[in-house]
Amino acid sequence: MVFSPHTADDRARMLQEIGVERLEELFAAIPASYRFPQLDLPPAISEAEIYRELLEWSMQNFSTATTASFLGAGSYNHYVPAVVQQILWRGEFYTAYTPYQPEVSQGTLQAIYEFQSLICLLTGMEVSNASMYDGATALAEGALLCVSPPRGRNKIVVAGTVHPHYRSVLRTYTRGLPVSIVEVPIPETLRLQPNDVAQYLDDATACLVVQYPNFYGRIEDLAGFAERAHAVGARLVVSVYPIALGLLRPPGELGADVVTGEGQCLGIPQSFGGPALGILATRMELVRHLPGRLIGATVDREGKRGFVMVLQTREQHIRREKATSNICTNQGLMALAATVYLSTLGKQGLRKVAELCYHKAHYLAERIADLPAWNVIGDGPFFNEFAVRCPRDPREINAFLLERGIIGGLALGDLVPGQQDLMLLCATELTTREQIDRLVEALREATA
């Protein structure tokens, strides 16, 4: 195809049509100094030189590929099978966007359908949407779909043991809405009991929001929470760590009405904290309140199976006041990564990963508990994270560890008032015994 740019005559006729003589007159409102600013750029270099310079910069970073990491708190260092990245790189999939003529892209729709099916199997729920942005926004959307002002249900009760960032996002979502948020205080045990939340639940409560395992890694009594919430007509919203569900009972079997979660652990690298993947699944009775998109399977006139977008209740497609959310593009590419990851591991593979996380974290806890002046904090079972009380400022300890090539845990005082002496430590299937022993000796040295 031959491209013919505008000729001088074409430009002259266009300028005459809009009533100006010169092109520069169109930009008269912009100060001259800003029209063509002189940028302080270095001299041009070759592609090979650029690559070498960027590589040198990147080598200044601490990578979990070369550094022992005990940092979790929502973003976890799990192994990603090579097949996940290979499939993501395929040109047919390498976009996060859902096509505007979706039925033309049967491969994309089937991948999302499989994602929804896997999430339902994992969580024990009846319906899942096509993904959300991350665990925090998924939790906020999951809580809001329970709110019903016409029924007088406009109060959200949130366990203090839910991730602080998730609670912050929920407060942001509800700002300006006729919704009140009540937070249940964090007990010294770092594990809430059903009786702890009962006094905060009443006829105005839309839902109770908890985490499973909670922010401190402890496993709380979901069935007890569900019983307390349902007794007052409220729903139970549970934010999950998907890998833990390889060992733990699905929240759907324990009475959860809405399940949300962060899917980064399902085949997505940490990558400085993003991109992530939001999981949102509910009981079928709430399907009309689900935000985002929902893919379904059907049969065409010739009897052939096909996939269609059955629900997309967002403001681009229906009246704004009727939309369930203003979420636009979902995390389609990351949902594909999770689909390939779960399909590759299978039920037994996921259980094996969860078992490794569990046993390595408990070995780490046992070793630290033997250190003088160090205490493992919390009550009840935990999965792969736990809090410890440090004999020295956790931030100073982390700086000491980093000098020795170890990424320490999260200094909880940075997120939770009153927990300045606590550190949250994590272990995954990639954590080795040698790394754990090296951390313990470094902690011993740091507080000698």
Swiss-Prot record:
Keywords: Oxidoreductase. Pfam families: GDC-P (PF02347). It comes from the Bacteria. Its EC number is 1.4.4.2. GO terms for molecular function: glycine dehydrogenase (decarboxylating) activity. It catalyses: N(6)-[(R)-lipoyl]-L-lysyl-[glycine-cleavage complex H protein] + glycine + H(+) = N(6)-[(R)-S(8)-aminomethyldihydrolipoyl]-L-lysyl-[glycine-cleavage complex H protein] + CO2. The keyword Electron transport does not apply. One of its GO terms (biological process) is glycine decarboxylation via glycine cleavage system. NCBIfam families: PRK00451.1. The glycine cleavage system catalyzes the degradation of glycine. The P protein binds the alpha-amino group of glycine through its pyridoxal phosphate cofactor; CO(2) is released and the remaining methylamine moiety is then transferred to the lipoamide cofactor of the H protein. Belongs to the GcvP family. N-terminal subunit subfamily. The glycine cleavage system is composed of four proteins: P, T, L and H. In this organism, the P 'protein' is a heterodimer of two subunits. This is Probable glycine dehydrogenase (decarboxylating) subunit 1.
